[in-house]
């Protein structure tokens, strides 16, 4: 699933090519890709002839403000892509929604797994009421509101493993498997350590590392594991510099120990047994 750095990369790419341009037409090829309105034709009619004034990101959600005050919200979920095409092309496999712009350009939503969703919300609609998951998101991790004190308070009574806790969007908005593994490695924390057992010093270090890793991910244009690419069709480059994620069986870049992988709550976790010793996983 695209995580904060990947979604931010998409947001920046969309701002470069779609702002102020009228949406000439919309085509919906898979009805269930549209969450609201319930009828795809209504989605099409509300977006036709509108202009995108701004793109924002909240966690893993993309939010476009239109010239009439309405919103277009998109969540890429597991495999969604938003691709910008400057010349007409027939729909590729897994094309779900197409937005057409002047000069025959097209924004195309491609989603192999079909979990991605699009919402059109009227101007008087509160976004968090229409999409309840938005109401529970933690502050943006690169904002001033995401403080050490906030993170400490959220972890203090959390009995889950620290890896599972980091994937909770009410604790770290936009965090996913890749950057959680990277953050834990750089913090020296074993993924199975209970979140509530972290010392104040460990929480402070983890907070700083989360911000560092996410900034590095954004600077690298995200990570391409299987399907992610920017609207311009460019792969993310963070994966090539990853410390542990996706490197099972390879040597740790710090100590040379073989990177291992385990399963936690149905998700894979990559770690270095030497740099993230099991002895740190106290109080489980």
Curated annotation (Swiss-Prot):
Pfam family of the protein (one): H2TH
EC number, as in UniProt: 3.2.2.23, 4.2.99.18
Positions annotated as zinc finger (FPG-type): 243-277
Domain of life of the organism encoding this protein: Bacteria
One Gene Ontology MF term: 8-oxo-7,8-dihydroguanine DNA N-glycosylase activity
PANTHER family: FORMAMIDOPYRIMIDINE-DNA GLYCOSYLASE (PTHR22993:SF9)
Name used for this protein in its record: Formamidopyrimidine-DNA glycosylase
Organism of derivation: Synechococcus elongatus
């Amino acid at each position: 699933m695209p995580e904060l750095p990947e979604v931010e990369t998409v947001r920046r790419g969309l701002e470069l090519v779609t702002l102020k341009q009228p949406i000439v037409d919309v085509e919906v090829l898979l009805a269930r890709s549209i969450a609201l309105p319930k009828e795809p034709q209504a989605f099409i009619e509300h977006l036709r002839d509108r202009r995108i004034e701004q793109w924002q990101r909240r966690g893993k959600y993309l939010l476009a403000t239109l010239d009439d005050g309405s919103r277009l919200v998109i969540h890429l979920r597991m495999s969604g892509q938003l691709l910008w095409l400057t010349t007409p092309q027939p729909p590729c496999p897994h094309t779900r929604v197409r937005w057409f712009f002047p000069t025959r350009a097209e924004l195309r939503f491609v989603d192999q797994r079909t979990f991605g969703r699009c919402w059109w919300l009227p101007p008087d609609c509160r976004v968090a009421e229409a999409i309840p998951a938005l109401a529970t998101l933690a502050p943006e991790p690169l904002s001033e509101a995401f403080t050490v004190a906030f993170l400490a308070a959220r972890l203090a009574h959390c009995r889950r493993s620290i890896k599972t806790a980091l994937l909770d969007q009410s604790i770290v908005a936009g965090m996913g498997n890749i950057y959680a593994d990277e953050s834990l490695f750089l913090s020296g924390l074993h993924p199975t350590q209970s979140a509530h057992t972290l010392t104040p010093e460990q929480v402070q270090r983890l907070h700083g590392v989360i911000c560092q890793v996410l900034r590095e991910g954004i600077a690298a244009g995200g990570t391409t594991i299987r399907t992610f690419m920017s609207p311009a069709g460019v792969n993310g480059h963070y994966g090539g510099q990853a410390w542990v994620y996706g490197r099972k069986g390879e040597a740790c870049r710090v100590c040379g120990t073989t990177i291992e992988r385990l399963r936690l709550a149905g998700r894979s976790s990559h770690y270095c047994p030497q740099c993230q010793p099991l002895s740190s996983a106290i109080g489980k």
